[in-house]
Curated annotation (Swiss-Prot):
Keywords: Methyltransferase, S-adenosyl-L-methionine, Transferase, tRNA processing. This is tRNA(Phe) 7-((3-amino-3-carboxypropyl)-4-demethylwyosine(37)-N(4))-methyltransferase. It comes from Thermococcus sibiricus (strain DSM 12597 / MM 739). It comes from the Archaea. The keyword Repeat does not apply. S-adenosyl-L-methionine-dependent methyltransferase that acts as a component of the wyosine derivatives biosynthesis pathway. It catalyses: 4-demethyl-7-[(3S)-3-amino-3-carboxypropyl]wyosine(37) in tRNA(Phe) + S-adenosyl-L-methionine = 7-[(3S)-3-amino-3-carboxypropyl]wyosine(37) in tRNA(Phe) + S-adenosyl-L-homocysteine + H(+).
Length: 197
């Protein structure tokens, strides 16, 4: 028996305490709470982190410098062009990026069989970039991710490289992608009870 199987119940207890703390502080995306509760109700699984998918605008000092980047705007819902334009006006230096990231969930599984079962279910629900993120003596983690993603440079050092009509088009595409990811989350929530308890 692997250590992660022996320590699973203790790890789950700690993870659920952390989740409850995050819920009380309003740090969990509201549209994913129901799915998290369903996963955590399963005997052989628990969630360790999650994001329900987002549209964001980031200011980055240098290309690839995410460590020192600043979120100018972040939404876990569809956005209006006016919100994006207002947020872009906050840009005062470095590179300006418009991004869409798909939902991501990290789920600990009790056994490798449980992990594979969850991975197959997630992929069948459209989360094609899902994988077994970590297999070690201490933990076994499935990462549930989809393919939807946009990373678009908009400008640099206060200069905008694109016009408003282009922004209208990318906001429309971003909202469509986010809508698709939310549909996948709902499908996963509907299907998750197929996993053994």
């Amino acid at each position: 028996m692997f250590l992660y199987e022996k320590n699973f119940d203790l790890q789950k207890k700690k993870a659920l305490e952390s989740l409850n703390d995050a819920l009380e502080k309003g740090l969990v995306d509201s549209d994913i709470i129901s799915l998290l509760n369903k996963i955590n109700s399963l005997k052989n699984y628990f969630t360790t982190s999650s994001c329900s998918g987002r549209i964001s605008i980031m200011q980055m000092p240098d290309l690839g410098d995410k460590l020192n980047a600043i979120w100018l705007g972040k939404w876990h819902r569809e956005v209006k062009i006016e919100e994006v334009l207002d947020t872009i006006n906050k840009h005062d230096g470095g590179m300006l990026w418009f991004m869409v990231h798909s939902p991501i969930l990290h789920v600990s599984a009790k056994t490798l069989e449980d992990a594979v079962e969850l991975l197959n279910l997630a992929m069948a629900c459209g989360f094609k970039h899902s994988n077994i993120k970590s297999v070690s003596h201490k933990k076994l983690v499935v990462e549930i991710r989809s393919t939807e993603r946009m990373d678009i440079p908009l400008g640099s050092d206060g200069e905008l490289w694109v016009n408003e009509s282009y922004l209208v088009k990318i906001v429309s595409m971003a909202n469509l992608q986010l809508r698709r990811t939310k549909e996948k989350l709902r499908k996963l929530e509907d299907e998750i009870q197929k996993l053994k308890k």
